[in-house]
């Protein structure tokens, strides 16, 4: 390969690297990267920076759980589910009704919301996705997009467009956690960590770990992984592909069922709240690698940190700008994702 063809094939990557180098050089020349300037900035904004790091990690864990369902569905069924965010919204409304009508704690409601979304996902897969399995890719995308619009408008009819939220009777002041009594919100090195965000992060890590063990250690998980790698080969060794597709789609939607219950204590719900999660989840899946469970968690943490740190260095209205920059860099330099496999 000649030098000219090599440069031509990697022109976009070279331009991106050149742009980063120019920005760094400009900041150095203008004194913005001088040790004294950095020290002054840290003295003024150190607490804000630490708070952004803490919040980014906590939110990133939940993002990872949402993206996990999306990457699982794509890895096995080879379909991008644009209705993922709308299903998250449905899970939030289910949790809201359980809490306001039946006094079911949101963290207990996970045991109801996740199975309910599993059943809803299985029905969608059987009645909507399965008949279109041989359709062109763009038709499948339009199908899931139409499904998302249907779910959003159905929720709008039932609950109207008024944002709804809940306020837990605990989580502020001394809170008995069984093994110990903890005073919330936690204050560590100048950062504030609320109970609801910490609980969401820990539950997300736990559920991600459980799903990872399910995929790695059980016969069902081995069947799912075999189907993702080679459908025809899996069929030849006796695996029921249609059953695996149905279960996998159900597991993917169960992930957003759990995530919906986890975010409701600190996020108001309206019929379109899932759209932002949808966009973020797609970025995470591309960043972490299509079909990679650890990649979804890693991508979620990176995106969560990028969002929160972006607010420190730029106006809050540009919160997603840094996320899309990461998205473009991932597409240019590692299109298979951080932990994905090259096709």
Model-derived features with residue positions:
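Transmembrane helix-bundle core of multi-pass membrane transporters
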Residues: 131-132, 137-217, 244, 309, ...
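Alpha-helical transmembrane segments within multi-pass membrane transporters and channels
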Residues: 103-147, 154, 298-303, 334-335
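Inter-helical junctions in multi-pass inner-membrane proteins, predominant
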Residues: 32-59, 193, 214-219, 245-287, ...
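Short, non-helical or kinked segments that cap or interrupt transmembrane helices
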Residues: 61, 70-92, 106, 134-140, ...
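Cytosolic-side transmembrane-helix boundaries in multi-pass membrane proteins
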Residues: 1-33, 37, 48, 229-236, ...
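Membrane-interfacial amphipathic/re-entrant helices at transmembrane-helix boundaries
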Residues: 2-65, 94, 106-107, 136-140, ...
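Helix-loop-helix "hairpin" substructures at the membrane interface of multi-pass membrane proteins
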Residues: 59, 189-269, 293-298
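Membrane-embedded helix boundary and interhelical linker motif in transport proteins
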Residues: 54, 76-123, 127, 132, ...
């Amino acid at each position: 390969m000649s030098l000219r063809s090599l440069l031509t094939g990697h022109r976009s990557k070279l331009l991106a690297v050149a742009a980063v180098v120019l920005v760094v050089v400009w900041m150095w020349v203008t004194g913005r990267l001088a040790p004294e300037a950095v020290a002054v900035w840290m003295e003024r904004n150190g607490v804000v920076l630490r708070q952004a790091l803490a919040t980014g990690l906590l939110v990133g864990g939940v993002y990872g759980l949402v993206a996990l369902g999306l990457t699982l569905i794509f890895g096995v069924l080879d379909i991008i589910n644009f209705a993922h965010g709308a299903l998250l919204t449905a899970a939030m409304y289910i949790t809201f009704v359980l809490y306001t009508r039946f006094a079911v704690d949101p963290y207990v409601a996970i045991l109801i919301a996740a199975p309910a979304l599993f059943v809803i996902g299985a029905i969608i897969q059987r009645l909507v996705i399965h008949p279109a399995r041989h359709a062109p890719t763009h038709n499948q995308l339009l199908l899931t997009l139409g499904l998302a619009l249907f779910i959003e408008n159905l929720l709008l009819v039932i609950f109207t467009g008024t944002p709804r939220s809940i306020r837990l009777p605990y989580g502020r002041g001394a809170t008995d956690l069984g093994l110990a009594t903890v005073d919330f919100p936690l204050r560590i090195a100048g950062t504030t960590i609320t109970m609801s965000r910490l609980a969401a992060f820990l539950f997300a890590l736990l559920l991600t770990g459980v799903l990872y063990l399910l995929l790695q250690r059980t016969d069902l998980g081995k069947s799912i992984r075999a189907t993702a790698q080679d459908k025809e080969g899996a069929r030849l060794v006796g695996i029921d592909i249609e059953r695996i597709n149905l279960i996998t789609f159900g597991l993917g939607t169960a992930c957003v069922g759990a995530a919906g219950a986890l975010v409701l204590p600190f996020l108001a719900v309206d019929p379109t709240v899932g759209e932002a999660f949808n966009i973020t989840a797609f970025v995470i899946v591309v960043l972490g690698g299509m079909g990679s469970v650890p990649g979804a968690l890693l991508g979620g943490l990176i995106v969560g940190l990028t969002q929160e740190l972006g607010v420190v260095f730029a106006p809050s209205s540009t919160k997603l700008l840094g996320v899309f920059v990461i998205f473009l860099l991932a597409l240019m330099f590692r299109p298979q994702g951080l932990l994905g496999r090259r096709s």
